Amino acid sequence: MSCQGAVSPKGARKLHDADVVYLYDGSFEGFLCCVYESFAQHELPFAVWTPQRETATLYPVKDIATDPAVARRVFASFGKKLGAETEYLVSRDFLSGQEDKELLLLRFLHLAFALGPGTVKREGHPVVAPLYAMKKSLDWEVDKFQGFVRFEEHDGMLGAVIHPKNYILPLLRPHFCGRFPEEDFMIYDAVHQAVLLHEKHNTRLLELAAPLELPPPSA
């Protein structure tokens, strides 16, 4: 079944709640493959977990492999069939720290593909409202950390440690790279074990396998 066919409501069987858990790698591409599986099987899983959130369950666990080609087709269908506003909202809300974000996004996408691109504007709908609540939390936290990140010098580089609820480093990147274009700096997200590293005019987002300890601040 093609990806575009999987996300089309035309001729689709009725969506059903499935006693199954999706397990994926935690990446946005991996989530898009969960979207594909959900539409292909016409099912809404009981839960969607990453390896970090995996726990004991009586439900069967379905491993969802990350396929970049499938992910690209699914994402392209958002803009083509649902519009840029939906594409933006889903992408941004995936950065939320809310544990059930994947299920909330899946429910919304099933509704949006059934009702059309105007679904995203129905902010009071019980399926749509949680997405705007996640966006509000993200926006608030981005504004907060844009103004309150405290840097110290560590071996010639500015460094800061933050503890955000949401994964906001990608959203902080434009602000701090614009603010300190000539400086070498790093922002370490101790909650999500990720680093925004700006060095010699190059910027990278790095996911770490273990917690990072910064050296003592320079005297």
What do the PLM-derived regions correspond to, one by one?
Residues 2-3, 7-68:
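N-terminal ordered "arm"
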Residues 61-74, 202-217:
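Acidic, Ser/Thr-rich peripheral helices and adjacent loops at domain boundaries
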Residues 118-210:
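Internal, well-folded beta-alpha domain core
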